[in-house]
């Protein structure tokens, strides 16, 4: 479930709250969270390996040549700069976001967040020009999408949902918007994974625990890879409307479940 929903613009948090609530599952803990973040990172790097490779080696080559106008070096630099807003916001709000009794973690907030993002994504889909490519991106574009990542700190928004919406709003083609979103999100996903890995030092896993963690990482990586593949196919051939509809319905189901007592 987490592997599939982590990288889709449909909020993995909403799914990982509603399914355990319905089935009575317990919180899987930091080991599970670390595995999911690392799985997401592995999936994005493997799917967009051509872009990642070009950015890495192109930037290194540009540095040796001192060619700071090189397109690979510029994009890599912008990706780093675009990560700063969510790092600052994450550190500043960590006390509120990580508190067990934080109102932001309630199913009510998650439900309304799903609906709000469905509306914003719908507006982006309706009014966007869908003409630009990553080759036409600017520093301002990268920073705006980077700022949009802050929305991911609110449960129910989803990082891919907020950044895809921002990129579409800036006029990028649908598939290019998703590609831009994932590449810009690599440092944020990596930092989140490192944070969860740091939490693992508090967990004393035995051999069985590590084997379960490794299995979960592999399965989640594969499912996340195919989730990206599916997202790109939908955006290339159709539009973002399937995700708009799904998000909206998910938010309504969450709020109805709370009102009627299915969820708590």
Curated annotation (Swiss-Prot):
One of its GO terms (cellular component) is plasma membrane. InterPro entries: UppP. GO terms for molecular function: undecaprenyl-diphosphatase activity. Its main location: membrane. Keywords: Antibiotic resistance, Cell inner membrane, Cell membrane, Cell shape, Cell wall biogenesis/degradation, Hydrolase, Membrane, Peptidoglycan synthesis, Transmembrane, Transmembrane helix. It is found in: Cell inner membrane. The keyword GTP-binding does not apply. Pfam families: BacA. Its EC number is 3.6.1.27. Bacitracin is thought to be involved in the inhibition of peptidoglycan synthesis by sequestering undecaprenyl diphosphate, thereby reducing the pool of lipid carrier available. Belongs to the UppP family. Catalyzes the dephosphorylation of undecaprenyl diphosphate (UPP). Confers resistance to bacitracin. This is Undecaprenyl-diphosphatase 2. It comes from Mesorhizobium japonicum (strain LMG 29417 / CECT 9101 / MAFF 303099). The gene is uppP2.
């Amino acid at each position: 479930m987490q592997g599939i929903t982590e990288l889709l613009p449909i909020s993995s948090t909403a799914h990982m709250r509603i399914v355990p609530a319905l089935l009575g599952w317990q919180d899987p803990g930091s080991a599970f969270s670390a595995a999911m973040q690392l799985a997401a990172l592995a999936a994005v790097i493997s799917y967009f390996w051509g872009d990642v490779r070009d950015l890495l080696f192109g930037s290194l080559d540009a540095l040796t040549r001192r060619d700071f106008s090189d397109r690979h070096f510029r994009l890599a630099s912008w990706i780093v700069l675009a990560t700063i807003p969510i790092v600052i916001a994450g550190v500043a709000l960590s006390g509120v976001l990580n508190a067990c009794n934080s109102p932001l973690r309630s199913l009510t907030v998650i439900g309304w967040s799903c609906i709000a993002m469905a509306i914003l994504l719908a507006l982006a889909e309706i009014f966007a020009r869908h003409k630009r490519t990553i080759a036409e991106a600017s520093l301002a574009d990268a920073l705006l999408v980077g700022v949009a990542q802050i929305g991911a700190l609110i449960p129910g928004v989803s990082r891919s949902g907020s950044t895809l919406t921002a990129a579409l709003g800036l006029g990028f083609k649908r598939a290019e918007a998703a590609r831009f979103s994932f590449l810009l999100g690599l440092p944020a996903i990596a930092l989140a994974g490192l944070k969860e890995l740091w939490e693992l030092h508090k967990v004393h896993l035995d051999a069985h625990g590590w084997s379960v963690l490794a299995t979960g990482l592999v399965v989640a990586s594969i499912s996340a890879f195919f989730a990206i593949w599916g997202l790109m196919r939908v955006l290339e051939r159709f539009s973002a409307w399937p995700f708009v509809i799904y998000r909206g319905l998910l938010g309504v189901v969450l709020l109805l479940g709370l009102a009627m007592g299915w969820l708590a």
